Each structure stands twice: as C-alpha cells, then as structure tokens.
Swiss-Prot record:
Entry comment on modification after translation: N-glycosylated. Sugar chains contain mannose-6-phosphate. Synthesized as a 35 kDa precursor which is then processed into the mature 30 kDa form via cleavage of N-terminal and C-terminal propeptides. Processing of the precursor is mediated by multiple lysosomal proteases.
BP term (GO), one: antigen processing and presentation of exogenous peptide antigen via MHC class I
Name this protein carries in UniProt: Gamma-interferon-inducible lysosomal thiol reductase
Removed propeptide positions: 21-51, 227-244
Signal sequence extent: 1-20
Native organism taxonomy: Eukaryota, Metazoa, Chordata, Craniata, Vertebrata
Known partners and oligomeric status: Dimer; disulfide-linked.
A Pfam family reported for this protein in Swiss-Prot or TrEMBL: GILT
Gene that encodes it: IFI30
Length: 244
C-alpha cells in the first residue's frame, strides 16, 4: 500500500534517535482519561467537554489485508480520530469475513485473504490486548500503511511502544492467547444486527454507516455537546459543496 503524507508526518514527529522521555509527539497532545475496554477491542475515549453528553461511538469491523478496510482506517477513521478525539469513542474488531470452527477444543480460522491474514488479524488483536489503547491504535495504523506488515511490526513498535518487543506480540498471535482473542472478535462480529455483509463494516451509534466517506461530518453532526472548531469548518465546507 502506498504510504500517505500524513503518516510520514507522524513518523517525522517521532524520530527514534530522540529519548522517549523527551520525544515530542502527537501522543503528548492526546487527552487523558481513556475508558477501559473489553478484551480484543480498542476503545479510544477522551473526556467529553460535558460529562452528561454522550460521545459518538464508532465501531470498525475489518480484516487486516482487506484493501478497502485499510483505506478506510488510514484515510477516514485515523484523520477523524486525530481531529475530534474528544467527542469520539472508537472500537476496532479485527476479524471481518473470516470463519471459525472448533477442532478438538481449539478454534481454527479461515480468512478471506488466506492464512497470512489470519495471522495478522491475531497480531492486531494482540496489540489491542497488550498495549495502551491510544498506542495500539497508532501502531495498527502504522502497520496497515505498510506493504509488509510482518516485517514492519518491529519498526512500528519501536516508534510507538519501544518497550514492547515484536517477539512478544508474535508469541501472543501464534499461541493460545491469539486464538482466544480472535474467537472473541468472531463472536462480536457474529453478534452484529443486522449481520455484516462486507468489510469494512462501520457502525456509528449502533447504526450501520452505509456512506463511510464522510465520517468526520457525521460525527460532528451527531455529537450533541459543544463541538470542536473543526466541526464548524466541516459544516461550512458542506454548505459550499451543497450550494455549488
């Protein structure tokens, strides 16, 4: 997958030569107060401007090697997350169109893009399980941007989670823990109502989002509290397009 200018900017802001204690990054600007998540998921939740105003919930059901999933994650969800984190609650569920079966007490998986995708789904599930929420999200975005995700697991971890080894993540992915995490994601995916028909399958506030190309505009429209400044800009641009 071709690298995006946005990710290159992020990487430039996180040079490996800079000590972790003094490293300037977008992570330092992210609000604290992320809520605990269920295992196998990622819930990135910053403190809302008003505690009585619910955040907008966005859930992404996807698979690691799906081109459309990668495009949505990198070009739509990630930029939206960066711009309106304070009003957004995100859940990631890597599984997609895979199938599972129980063989002698162990779960075996068949993935749409082959065994490599099953492994990468487990890798991302393990990242979500073992890393702090924001760090896991950024690491997954880093991986999904790369053509060879296995080879880039270590570099992406060195950028965002230098104390975590790629070997520990791969041990999780290839062991019982990875199998358990993917089974949990299978259950979450199978529980969708209506059932998912394709991936990426995006659910916003409990409703399937058919038009996944205007996520920022939708999040801004649905949030009932004081909106970030970028929402006003989005509304003005929408009006300009409408009148043209």
């Amino acid at each position: 997958m071709a690298s995006s200018p946005l990710l290159f900017v992020l990487l430039l802001l996180l040079p490996l030569e800079v000590p972790a204690a003094t490293r300037w990054s977008l992570l330092e600007a992210l609000p604290e107060g992320a809520a605990p998540c269920q295992v196998g998921e990622l819930c990135l939740q910053a403190s809302p401007q008003k505690p009585d105003v619910p955040l907008v919930n966005v859930s992404l059901y996807y698979e690691a090697l799906c081109p459309g999933c990668r495009e949505f994650l990198i070009r739509e969800l990630f930029p939206t997350w960066l711009m309106v984190l304070e009003i957004l609650n995100v859940t990631l569920v890597p599984y997609g169109n895979a199938q599972e079966r129980n063989v002698s007490g162990k779960w075996e998986f068949t993935c749409q893009h082959g065994e490599r995708e099953c492994l990468l789904n487990k890798v991302e599930a393990c990242l979500l399980d073992q890393l702090e929420q924001k760090i896991a999200f950024l690491t997954i975005v880093c991986l999904e941007e790369m053509d060879d995700m296995e080879q880039n697991l270590k570099p992406c971890l060195q950028i965002y989670a230098p104390k975590v080894s790629a070997d520990s993540i791969m041990e999780c992915a290839t062991g019982n823990r990875g199998m358990q995490l993917l089974h949990i994601n299978a259950q979450l995916t199978d529980a969708l109502r209506p059932p998912h028909k394709y991936v990426p399958w995006v659910v916003v506030n409990g409703e399937h989002m058919k038009d996944a190309e205007h996520l920022l505009h939708l999040v801004c429209r649905l949030y009932q509290g004081q909106k970030p400044d970028v929402c006003q800009l989005t509304a003005e641009l929408s009006k300009e397009v409408h009148f043209k």
